[in-house]
Amino acid sequence: EDFSDYGVIAGGPMMGPLLEDLNGFITKKDKGFIILPKNHPLIKKKSCTFDQARRVNRSACEQCRMCTDLCPRYLLGHNMQPHKMMRTLSYAPHDVEAQKIASLCCQCNLCEYFSCPANLHPRTTNAIFKQNLAEAKVRYQPTETEFHARESRKYRLVPSKRLVARLGLHDFDRPAPWTEETLHPNEVRISTRQHVGAPAVPVVSAGDHVE
């Protein structure tokens, strides 16, 4: 089929990456795929590059703190404060020490897809800083070992229905019943590397009969 007018997300709408190459194959790590028109807001958001996000973030962030106030990591008691990372991007982009707390980001994308009223890219900023820290071989060292959820957490949880609506997926949120259809492919190829670590070692050879 022709997917030139569509974008394909591997996994969920929040953390799933946008596939750049559709000539790959399904592995045991794949949970599902979301196919949306290329002009869909979510596809456009996921298509944003580091350079594009950097320029927009520097010019439009109003330091409203909404990204931090709704951040799941922050609400659990961690020192993850996306609005400070946005500030660092604008005023101290080369200060590696100030970028350390970006390591606490779990890349859930709530700040980027829901919280920010200006439609900016706080999560991408954290990804940029994580890349900088990796290149500089700098690791975040926590100053605390015990964390306690902030008292405001129970009032700041995001309703899933509201999130689906904000993502523009309400029209696509419909039952997907299991199908009993049996597929009979002519050829099956199994990658020996579908996980972290060394590739798997085949126990059969080319031409062997496998039931």
Language-model features: locations:
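Short, well-structured beta-strand-loop connectors
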Residues: 69-71, 205-210
